[in-house]
Amino acid sequence: MTHIATWKGKEIAKSDRTLEVDGYVYFPRDSVRMDLLKPTPKTANDLKCPHGVQFYDVAEGTRTSQRAAWSYEAPQAKMKPVDHWIGFWEDVAIS
């Protein structure tokens, strides 16, 4: 099944190799418009995450959705299959 991530009417990810973990769909990086993702500074809560989470703002021009994407940079066992893959939430629609 092909999944598509859409943000403000723009397709930002598309793949038939997605994985679903804990209700979230994760996309391989090579299927994501990484030019629209801007890494955010790590918060104290981010640093407590056992999976080494990195959040991203989704941004283009003057439009930004803060921390609307993330990846696990050093995942523990359960999240290992989505190591460095991108998950979306907030106002990013997955179909």
Where are these regions (language model features)?
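Terminal leader/tail segments of proteins
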Residues: M1-S95
